[in-house]
Amino acid sequence: MNFFIKLIVFLFIQGVLQLTIQEAQAKKLTFVRDAETESGIRALITPLLQSAGLDNDSVNIYIVNDPTLNAFVAGGPNIFLHTGLLATSGSASQLIGVLAHEIGHISGGHLSKLAAAQKRASNEALIGTILGGAASFLLGNPSAGSAIMSGGQHVGTRNLLRFSRTQELSADRAAIRYLDASKQSAQGMLNFM
């Protein structure tokens, strides 16, 4: 019985930690507003959005004041570009390649698919935990239970990583299609990524 109490506490703490991590990440973002930069990025992204069949006004661009080399899509059709990415881009074609990749995530519906993949991975880990707890209790062998729990977590993590790699490859392929359709070179994307 003691094991099940620990399990419930563990799952509760995991949920609280996840919320805390998400809140902390959201609060850390500070944005840069610069009309000239935003206008330039919008000019670069417009042909790509047209190639992807997306409405230019439906995609928002945010510049995040962060020196790291990063870009991501979050919260719907929102592209976040770190200032570090903008500073590090050696050419417009490199930035265009990154933008095309992020548009690939949006047009592929990867955010909604990610939520489903995370839920599956969480369920796989939870099933492993429940089976491990049951095995530990029924067999009287905590080591066997721990091994099953670890296996369930490993399966969930591995499947989520596989999903992530698939989505990244899909976004890259879409980016190349959008670059070709808008008559832009993919060389910057290939050099930068």
Segments and roles (model prediction):
Residues 136-149:
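N-terminal accessory/precursor segments of enzymes
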Residues 6-18:
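Bacterial N-terminal signal peptides
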Residues 146-155, 193:
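Short, conserved phosphate-binding/catalytic loop or strand-edge motifs used
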Residues 24-139, 156-163, 169-193:
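Peri-catalytic and regulatory segments of divalent metal-dependent proteins
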Residues 1-4:
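N-terminal secretory signal peptides that target proteins for export/translocation
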